[in-house]
Design a protein with these regions (language model features):
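A post-motif C-terminal structural segment
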Residues: 34-49, 60-65, 75-81, 85-128, ...
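Structural beta-sheet core signal
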Residues: 69-70, 176, 385
Length: 519
């Protein structure tokens, strides 16, 4: 036995010397040299960077060639649960046990969505957190909390570098896809810096150093980083057309701009490779496997809800189709890419108290995630799926298994609707606040609860009832889910700050330097 040990121990020692250590902090060599963004001294940035760096020290991080950030605007956890049941029932399957594609990703976390100044945040501050690593003031985009809302003079010295800025400087391809306006809060955070998210087509003030500000659409065209976006898809043509120009699809609708800049013409003038498309036919005709740089503005304002696309006059692609096209184009770059995909209209349907469209939009968003997973590899592409904030929709009552998620709550075997203390049935889905609390009767506001006995609550236009009346339902402030796969996804776990998502993407892709490099 001693002879055997004597012969074996040197071999084991040699094997150990040749085996990579399993110690904490063992990470593969990054693909790129990390950059130090100009907001690196911001307190929110520092705390997030240190938190993610500590996880890297424990777990290591694999390098990601590509990064895709999926944001379901307003897709809180109750929305995910209801969308799961809806998607299953829509396909004739058991809704409760159905799995959305996003739910199959191996790593999960909860994200804290508060902004610098609000417990319940808006989409501008939350998008800024995810793409720049700082929490900022609500209704501001791409600037730190040191700048003031609606005040252009306060912006200087409080600018940021987004992950997309850093990607362009490193020579990567970049893209942004949304079903909202391209200049709306979430997509706008990728390229713009403004003290007011509403300045999409013009600066809405003449005070506080207004001359120092540029509207969001103009910032998209004038974006100084690298060679600009390879693909940018969404709605919002009205912000890009010269003052007085009528929309090509709706001849009674005019441009939002107040100046003579024709931003579409400026885009096309950049190079022969710059293309512009506005409808399904143009989308179908484009070769996304080329080196074209494509701006697609498919609607005057926001794109159609997915369940309404069929009646759109000019036709427009689904979010899944836009995602496939974006990945096809971005994959032409051998150096890798960074892409944001937003399901922007989940949020809009919730604000309207319209759960049917909100859940259908979440299902369409999930199909876009499935498309991305089919086209990419978990070996080199980090995919993160999350929401920017939640909404006040709840799932309540005691509906039995298989009860239509959009229907009246029923716990009985024969399907008889359950009734509240007022003797009226109620839906499984409802809102804390919103337009569904009241209705107009003979020109007056009637806020007594409507008897839903003979109402088709599964109709796509049905507005859920709410507890107290508001013209627009409000955001929710609870934590939202984060799902992740691919290199760097191992850093997504526990309860994290929303701005840590930037650090996860930046460190995994090698675009962002470790905290020690910022000192």
């Amino acid at each position: 036995m001693r002879k055997l040990l004597a012969a074996t121990l040197p071999a084991l020692a040699l094997l150990a010397a040749c085996t990579p250590p399993a110690a904490t902090g063992d990470a593969a060599k990054p693909l790129r040299t990390g950059q130090v963004p100009q907001q690196a001294a911001d307190a929110y940035y520092v705390r997030a960077a240190e938190a993610v760096d500590a996880r890297i020290a424990q777990r290591g991080v694999k390098p990601a060639k590509n990064v895709i950030l999926f944001i379901g605007d307003g897709m809180g956890i109750s929305t995910i649960t209801a969308a799961r049941i809806y998607a299953g029932q829509k396909r004739g399957l058991d809704g409760e046990s159905y799995r959305l594609t996003m739910e199959t990703l191996p790593y999960t976390a909860l994200s804290k969505t508060y902004s610098n100044d609000f417990q319940v945040a808006d989409s501008a501050s939350t998008a800024t957190a995810m793409v720049t690593g700082v929490k900022t003031n609500s209704r501001t985009l791409g600037i730190t909390s040191g700048a003031n809302f609606d005040n252009c003079a306060s912006v200087e010295g409080h600018r940021t570098d987004s992950l997309f800025d850093l990607a362009e400087r490193a020579g990567l391809a970049t893209g942004v896809v949304t079903t909202a306006r391209l200049t709306h809060a979430t997509p706008g955070a990728t390229y713009s810096e403004t003290p007011d998210r509403d300045w999409e087509a013009y600066v809405g003030t003449e005070e506080n150093g207004a001359e120092a500000c540029e509207d969001i659409a103009a910032q998209f065209i004038d974006w100084p980083e690298g060679d600009g976006f390879e693909v940018a898809f969404g709605g919002g043509r009205a912000a890009f057309l010269k003052k007085g120009t009528m929309d090509p699809e709706y001849d009674s609708r005019e441009s939002y701009r107040r100046d003579d800049r024709d931003l579409v013409a400026e885009w096309l003038a950049k190079s022969d490779q710059h293309k512009y498309i506005t409808d399904q036919a143009g989308f179908d005709a484009e070769n996304f496997a080329s080196d074209d740089k494509v701006l697609g503005l498919f609607e005057y304002s926001h794109m159609e809800y997915d369940m309404d696309r069929a009646v759109d006059p000019a036709g427009e692609p689904s979010l899944a189709d836009l995602t496939r096209a974006a990945i096809t184009r971005l994959s032409q770059d051998p150096d890798g890419f960074v892409l944001m995909v937003e399901g922007g209209r989940i949020d809009h349907a919730h604000h309207a108290g319209n759960a049917a469209r909100a859940l259908d939009e979440a299902d369409a968003f999930d199909q876009a995630i499935a498309a991305a997973l089919e086209m990419t590899s978990a070996d080199d592409t980090l995919i993160i799926v999350t929401a920017d904030h939640s909404h006040t929709m709840t799932i309540s009552g005691y509906p039995k298994r298989g009860n239509p998620i959009l229907g009246l709550a029923s716990s009985s075997l024969d399907g008889t609707p359950d009734k509240a203390l007022d003797g009226k049935p109620y839906t499984t889905l409802g809102y804390m606040n919103g337009p569904g609390a009241c209705r107009s009767v003979d020109g007056k506001l009637d806020c007594t609860r409507l008897d839903l006995t003979n109402v088709d609550t599964t109709d796509k236009d049905f507005v859920q009832q709410s507890l107290y009346p508001m013209w627009s339902e409000a955001h929710g402030g609870e934590d939202v889910a984060v799902f992740a796969s691919g290199p760097g996804s191992e850093l997504v776990s526990g309860v994290i700050e929303e701005n840590e998502i930037f650090q996860v993407m930046g460190r995994a892709s090698g675009l962002v330097a470790a905290p020690a490099a910022t000192e």
